[in-house]
UniProtKB/Swiss-Prot annotation:
The gene is CAVIN4. The modification Phosphoserine is found at residues 172-173, 355. InterPro entries: Cavin_fam. Component of the CAVIN complex composed of CAVIN1, CAVIN2, CAVIN3 and CAVIN4. Interacts with CAVIN1, ADRA1A and ADRA1B. Interacts with CAVIN2; this augments the transactivation of NPPA. Interacts with CAV3. Interacts with MAPK1 and MAPK3. Modulates the morphology of formed caveolae in cardiomyocytes, but is not required for caveolar formation. Facilitates the recruitment of MAPK1/3 to caveolae within cardiomyocytes and regulates alpha-1 adrenergic receptor-induced hypertrophic responses in cardiomyocytes through MAPK1/3 activation. Contributes to proper membrane localization and stabilization of caveolin-3 (CAV3) in cardiomyocytes. Induces RHOA activation and activates NPPA transcription and myofibrillar organization through the Rho/ROCK signaling pathway. It is found in: Cytoplasm, Myofibril, Sarcomere; Cytoplasm; Cytoplasm, Cytosol; Cell membrane, Sarcolemma. It comes from Homo sapiens (Human). This is Caveolae-associated protein 4. Residues 231-256 have a biased composition (Basic and acidic residues).
Length: 364
C-alpha cells in the first residue's frame, strides 16, 4: 500500500514538473509571437510611410509635368506669334526695300538732271551771256525769256554772232526774243475760251434755233409715220365715237328713268297691308270698278304688249329676246296672251288722305 502511495506521489510530482515546463514554454512562445508581431507591425508602418512618400513624390512629378506642359504651350504660342511678327517684318522690309529702290531711281534721275543743269550752267558761265531787259509801264514784264539759236554752230560762228545777240534798241521788236507764257496763264485763257464757247452754245438764239430744228424734224417724222389724210380720218372716227358714246349714255339715262317710274312706290305696299283689314269698302269699290272696268279693258286691248314700250331704245337682238316665247303644243293652237284686267278700289282714309289703288292682275 505504501509502495503504491509513493508511486502515485511520484507521478503527481512528475506531472507537476511537466505542467510547469509546458507553462514556461507557452510563455516563451507567446513572447516570441508578440515580438514578431511588433516587428511585422513596424515593417508594415515603414512600408506604408514609404508608399505615402512615393505617392507624394508621384503627385509632385505630375504637377511638375503639368507645369512643363503649360510652359511648352506658352512657348509654342509665343513662337507662333514671333513667327507671325517676323513674317510681317519681312513684308515690311520688302516694301521698304522696294520703296528704297524707287527712291534710288528717283535720286539717280535727279542726279542726272542736276548734272545736266550743271553742264548748262557751266556753258552759260563760259559764254557769259547775261542780258537785262527793261520794259516800260505800258508793257507787262515777261515771266521767262528764251533765245533762238543753233547748237550746231562752231565757236567761230558763236564769236561772230555775239554782236547779233546784243540787246535790241526797240523793245517792241520780237525778232530774237519772245515771251513764254506761264502754265497758269494758259490754263486761264483755255478756261475762259471754254466758258465763252459754252455761253455761246447755250445762248437764247442758239436755243431757239435748236428748238426750231427739233420741231421741223418732229413734224417730218410725223408726216412720214402718219399722213395728214389718215390723221383726218382718225379725228373724224374719234368724233363719231364720242357722239355714239353720248347717245348711249342718254339712252341709258332714259332707260333708268323709265325703270324708276315703272317701279311701285312704298305707299302702295303700305296701303295693300291696310286693305286686308278693311273688307267693308270692298263692295262699294267693286260697283265703281264695274262701271270703269269696261273702258279700261277696251283700251288695254288696243295697246300692244309691254315689250313694245321700249322698242326704240332696244336693239334688234334685244328686241327679239324681249318678245314672249311660249312652249309649242302638239295639235294645239298657240295661246295668245290675255289682256290685263284693271280694277279700281276705294282706299281707306289714312291720315286724312284719299287715293285709289290700281291693281294689275293677270287673269289665270
Amino acid at each position: 500500500m505504501e509502495h503504491n502511495g509513493s508511486a502515485s506521489n511520484a507521478d503527481k510530482i512528475h506531472q507537476n514538473r511537466l505542467s510547469s515546463v509546458t507553462e514556461d514554454e507557452d510563455q516563451d512562445a507567446a513572447l516570441t509571437i508578440v515580438t514578431v508581431l511588433d516587428k511585422v507591425a513596424s515593417i508594415v508602418d515603414s512600408v506604408q510611410a514609404s508608399q505615402k512618400r512615393i505617392e507624394e513624390r508621384h503627385r509632385e512629378m505630375e504637377n511638375a509635368i503639368k507645369s512643363v506642359q503649360i510652359d511648352l504651350l506658352k512657348l509654342s504660342q509665343s513662337h507662333s506669334n514671333t513667327g507671325h511678327i517676323i513674317n510681317k517684318l519681312f513684308e515690311k522690309t520688302r516694301k521698304v526695300s522696294a520703296h528704297i529702290k524707287d527712291v534710288k531711281a528717283r535720286v539717280e534721275k535727279q542726279q542726272i538732271h542736276v548734272k545736266k543743269v550743271e553742264v548748262k550752267q557751266e556753258e552759260i558761265m563760259k559764254k557769259n551771256k547775261f542780258r537785262v531787259v527793261i520794259f516800260q509801264e505800258k508793257f507787262r514784264c515777261p515771266t521767262s525769256l528764251s533765245v533762238v539759236k543753233d547748237r550746231n554752230l562752231t565757236e567761230n560762228q558763236e564769236e561772230d554772232d555775239d554782236d547779233i545777240f546784243d540787246p535790241p534798241v526797240d523793245l517792241s521788236s520780237d525778232e530774237e526774243y519772245y515771251v513764254e507764257e506761264s502754265r497758269s496763264a494758259r490754263l486761264r485763257k483755255s478756261g475762259k475760251e471754254h466758258i465763252d464757247n459754252i455761253k455761246k452754245a447755250f445762248s437764247k438764239e442758239n436755243m431757239q434755233k435748236t428748238r426750231q430744228n427739233l420741231d421741223k424734224k418732229v413734224n417730218r417724222i410725223r408726216t412720214r409715220i402718219v399722213t395728214p389724210e389718215r390723221r383726218e380720218r382718225l379725228r373724224q372716227s374719234g368724233e363719231r365715237l364720242r357722239q355714239s358714246g353720248e347717245r348711249l349714255r342718254q339712252s341709258g339715262e332714259r332707260f333708268k328713268k323709265s325703270i324708276s317710274n315703272a317701279a311701285p312706290s312704298k305707299e302702295a305696299f303700305k296701303m295693300r297691308s291696310l286693305r286686308k283689314g278693311k273688307d267693308r269698302t270692298v263692295a262699294e269699290g267693286e260697283e265703281c270698278a264695274r262701271e270703269m272696268g269696261v273702258d279700261i279693258i277696251a283700251r288695254s286691248e288696243s295697246l300692244g304688249p309691254i315689250s313694245e314700250l321700249y322698242s326704240d331704245e332696244l336693239s334688234e337682238p334685244e328686241h327679239e329676246a324681249a318678245r314672249p316665247v311660249y312652249p309649242p303644243h302638239e295639235g294645239r293652237e298657240i295661246p295668245t296672251p290675255e289682256p290685263l284686267k284693271v280694277t279700281f278700289k276705294s282706299q281707306v282714309k289714312v291720315e286724312d288722305d284719299e287715293s285709289l289703288l290700281l291693281d294689275l292682275k293677270h287673269s289665270s
